[in-house]
């Protein structure tokens, strides 16, 4: 039975003009993951990832620290592991935040900007997942969930069932894949999502016709550094 190791990307550049780029801390998180994987004897024999820059940068940093692994031209790139459109989900809930600079202005009005964003974004996601407004979105929650599951299905059909595959992806995709494994209802599923840390490791065991959860959101590679600032969620 092989393992599919789902890795949430390192910390991205939240609040910057280009979110889809690892922050210096995100790069460090990914390197720590690679060093930990090497020390623990994990096999990074096959790598898959979504199409986002932060996915590729996370894989690059991780494998550099690991010191081995497949060449980048041999990685499996599949849009099934891409994140949902955060911006669209947000502005369908808060159209006033669609204008350039509007989100930054919104955050400056709060003494606790990260908390204010999380509260607003959680409400936006609840609207999206609730499926009462599916026609408002280019990709509804059911469509996103099916896209992620199809990506996992393609991966399982491509690799040997005894082979381990490391998949560098995003929190939403991991959440969608775990929903079918754990049978969590829609209205509860993003309670899991909010707990997923950057470069957290979720391991699935798979064989033909069966996928089961082995490890959820492990952050041992960060915890062993005894630096709380390494634990991030965006």
Residue ranges and their predicted role:
Residues 3-5, 10-65, 140-147:
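Loop-to-helix element that buttresses phosphate recognition and phosphoryl-transfer chemistry
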Residues 165-177:
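A short beta-strand-loop-alpha-helix capping motif that often carries His-Thr
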Residues 34-119:
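Phosphate-coordination/substrate-recognition cap region in phosphate-metabolizing enzymes
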Residues 2, 68, 83-112, 142, ...:
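Acidic, low-complexity terminal tails and accessory targeting/binding regions
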Residues 10, 171-172, 217:
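Active-site metal-binding loops of divalent metal-dependent hydrolases
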Residues 5, 76-78, 214:
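General small-molecule cofactor/ligand-binding pocket signal
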Residues 102-143:
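Short glycine/proline- and acidic residue-enriched helix-loop micro-motifs
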Residues 135-165:
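A mid-sequence, solvent-exposed acidic-amphipathic segment
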